[in-house]
Amino acid sequence: MELEQLKCFVAAAEELHFGRAAQKMGILPASLGRHLRLLEESLGTRLMSRTTRSVALTEDGVALLEEVRPLLHRLQTLAEEFRSRKTQQATVLRIGAIDSAAAGLIPPLLHDFRERFPGIITQLVEDKSIRLIPKLIAGRLDIVFIRPRDGLNRNLVVRTLTQETPVIALPVTHPLANRERISVDELREEPLIVPERRSRPHSYDLTMKLFEDAGLHPRIAQTADEKQTIINLVAAGIGSAIVPRWTAKLAVFGVTFVPLMTVGGISLRKLPLAAAWAKAVRDPGRDQLLELLDTNIDRYAEQA
């Protein structure tokens, strides 16, 4: 017994005419007749009495119709539900981002992406670069926004997007707090709050390099990893901190943010932000995000 045989039987039972039933099924009358004969053989009973003028259901045919018709209707409903579910199943794009990207570039990017591609669900994971990269390599993320570094996995594509502007976070009571710009040379005696290098190598190295280029040694007063914690420590008067410009959005009471200059008076812009993804993986959603990013990078970079 096959599903197609049961469908042919129900069509013939409803039409009581082989020609119309065959047309309804989209097959030839001879094919319809063959399906019915095979069904009767498998059940070992006559389901229809047929003459050249009429078709009628036998008692067994009536009993079978009562059982089969609701079953076929339910199967049809289930098939439609399955097809609809598959059609509506959204693509998921898994995005990893360091705090700088999550606070600056990502919000306007995701706003535009969701408007342009409403059928793609975006999942955002915020973490440090050293944790995001292994997740990308393992296939748990589709694209990450990180601080690029030398020696990344050769199976990754890494594209630098922008250079974030570092500023100095100072307590509002600090003598330099009202300045429009501050030279690194003016921070020679300033107690600094820096992240641990093992967790945030780019941020740590940036501070070290700025002082090294100025021929100075930084005075490290405290280490802390999270930007919110660092800014809170600045507010408490523990010290000052060189941080990305976006941290001003944290709006912690008692802290001001002043642009930095090198000793020669040139404004700084030395915190690279990059996108990375798996070289061998094809992902239309990721590629659409990258295309949108390429088109609007100047506007998004303003938030960095």
UniProtKB/Swiss-Prot annotation:
Transcriptional regulator of the ttuABCDE tartrate utilization operon. One of its GO terms (molecular function) is DNA-binding transcription factor activity. Gene3D superfamilies: Periplasmic binding protein-like II, Winged helix-like DNA-binding domain superfamily/Winged helix DNA-binding domain. CDD domains: PBP2_LTTR_aromatics_like. It holds the Pfam family HTH_1. Belongs to the LysR transcriptional regulatory family. InterPro entries: LysR_subst-bd, Tscrpt_reg_HTH_LysR, WH-like_DNA-bd_sf, WH_DNA-bd_sf. The keyword Nucleotidyltransferase does not apply. This is HTH-type transcriptional regulator TtuA. It comes from Agrobacterium vitis (Rhizobium vitis). Residues 1-58 form the HTH lysR-type domain. Residues 18-37 bind DNA. SUPFAM superfamilies: Periplasmic binding protein-like II, Winged helix' DNA-binding domain. One of its GO terms (cellular component) is protein-DNA complex. Keywords: DNA-binding, Plasmid, Transcription, Transcription regulation. It comes from the Bacteria.
